[in-house]
């Protein structure tokens, strides 16, 4: 390091006591000479070491100076200042206890950390004719020696062409640039290789054998550069997308046996079955041979239409089939007749509607006193008479299931006259 003037043995004033002084000095903001220079000794600084920001060519009639962390000259970034008259050192909010100010405006930073890297601003106050001050502002950027980087990966075992991977160069280093290398060559930019805004993260969209690596990253700043060890992705073979074959897509409820098969067959895979997005639970009604590739349902209900999926897995992951949904045939259930009124007066309107749960929809027909009236769900008589009294039956039939059902009600029509 260069020759230093010993720091004065003076009183040390907290930064709050400088509020008025700082405002006055900033008010005298006139241009000055640009011959002042700042250099770091040593030029390559490692974390945990000391560095001196050595100032050259200080002007005559120096009144004082202020050091700031960064390029913002405010109290928040204020480290320390020195006032020549009285040899007073003042510390600000950005003072960490590791900075030492010297009378020649140099600043010693001990036990340097990564947070210390970055720009520093020296604000010099110079006396002129004794009635006003002249100030100058000089900025210097401190660069630490770059650490040896390492590469972290979101997935070291991606599926070929199927999975995206992000590679990140660690650690995050201020005021440094990042470079990437693949197969020892500068990284080519293609549609499948993208860099983040800072170049610190590399995105690989669909890894192939040509983009599996090895990869290296480099951290570089004006004083040093360091490159990581190579990282190569373990490219896994692409899993074939499975599909389901089934013996009957239109089973009858509680009657037909269903056989699901997950294709393709391979001894290298394990098979998993899914129903409605949930792993199919173990149940006495569900039969699965040892290999689990075949799923047997001795019967199925209307609540088990699916969707069904099968998944093939290896030690690194799996892939699911497209969903398969059953068209379960059921019903007709016992029909319902609305409204349930049974008493009418002559001349009123009779309107009855019949419904029954059924898939496919059931066929409907009505009989009155065992005489066929008409097909359809609804029965309408505009002017009912006593002749319409009797037993009304709604019959339903599902031709797909071969099942029938019916519901009856008694209607009583009374004669009445206006008194």
Curated annotation (Swiss-Prot):
Residues 149-234, 240-327, 335-410 form the Ig-like C2-type domain. GO terms for cellular component: extracellular region. Its main location: secreted. It comes from the Eukaryota. One of its GO terms (biological process) is female pregnancy. Residues 35-144 form the Ig-like V-type domain. It is found in: Secreted. CDD domains: IgC2_CEACAM5-like, IgI_hCEACAM_2_4_6_like, IgV_CEACAM_D1. Keywords: Disulfide bond, Glycoprotein, Immunoglobulin domain, Repeat, Secreted, Signal. Coiled coil: none annotated. The keyword Cell cycle does not apply. Transmembrane segments: none annotated. Glycans are attached at residues 61, 104, 111, 199, 259, 268, 303. Disulfide bonds join 169-217, 262-310, 354-394. Residues 1-34 form the signal peptide. Belongs to the immunoglobulin superfamily. CEA family. This is Pregnancy-specific beta-1-glycoprotein 1. It comes from Homo sapiens (Human).
């Amino acid at each position: 390091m260069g020759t230093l003037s010993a720091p004065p043995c003076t009183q040390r004033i907290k930064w709050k006591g400088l509020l008025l002084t700082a405002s006055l000095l900033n008010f005298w903001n006139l241009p000055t000479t640009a011959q002042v220079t700042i250099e770091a000794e040593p030029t390559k600084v490692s974390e945990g070491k000391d560095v001196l920001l050595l100032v050259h060519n200080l002007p005559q009639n120096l009144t004082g100076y202020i050091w700031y962390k960064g390029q913002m000259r405010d109290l928040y970034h204020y480290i320390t200042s020195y006032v020549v008259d009285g040899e007073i050192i003042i510390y600000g909010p950005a003072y960490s206890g590791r900075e030492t100010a010297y009378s020649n405006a140099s600043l010693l930073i001990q036990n340097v950390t990564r947070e210390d890297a970055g720009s520093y601003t020296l604000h010099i106050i110079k006396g002129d004719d004794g009635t006003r001050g002249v100030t100058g502002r000089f900025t210097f950027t401190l660069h630490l020696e770059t650490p040896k980087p390492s590469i972290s990966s979101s997935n070291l075992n991606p599926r070929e062409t199927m999975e995206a991977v992000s590679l990140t160069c660690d650690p995050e280093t201020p005021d440094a640039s990042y470079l990437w290398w693949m197969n020892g060559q500068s990284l080519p930019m293609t549609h499948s290789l993208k860099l983040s805004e800072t170049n610190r993260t590399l995105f690989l969209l669909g890894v192939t054998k040509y983009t599996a690596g090895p990869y290296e990253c480099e951290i570089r700043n004006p004083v040093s550069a360091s490159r990581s060890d190579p990282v190569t992705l373990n490219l896994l073979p692409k899993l074939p997308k499975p599909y389901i074959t089934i013996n009957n897509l239109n089973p009858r409820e509680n009657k037909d046996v269903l056989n699901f098969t997950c294709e393709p067959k391979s001894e290298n895979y394990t098979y998993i079955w899914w129903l409605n997005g949930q792993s199919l639970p173990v149940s006495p009604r569900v039969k699965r041979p040892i290999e689990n590739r075949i799923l047997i349902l001795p019967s199925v209900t209307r609540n088990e239409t699916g969707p069904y999926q099968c998944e093939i897995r290896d030690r690194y992951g799996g892939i699911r089939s497209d969903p398969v949904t059953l068209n379960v045939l059921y019903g007709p259930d016992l029909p319902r007749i609305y409204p349930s009124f049974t008493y009418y007066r002559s001349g009123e309107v009779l309107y009855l509607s019949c419904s029954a749960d059924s898939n496919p929809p059931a066929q409907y027909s009505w009989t009155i006193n065992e005489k066929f009236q008409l097909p359809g769900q609804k029965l309408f008589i505009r002017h009912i008479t006593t002749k319409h009294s009797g037993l009304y039956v709604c019959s339903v039939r599902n031709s797909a299931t071969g099942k029938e059902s019916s519901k009856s009600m008694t209607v009583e029509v009374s004669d009445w006259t206006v008194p």
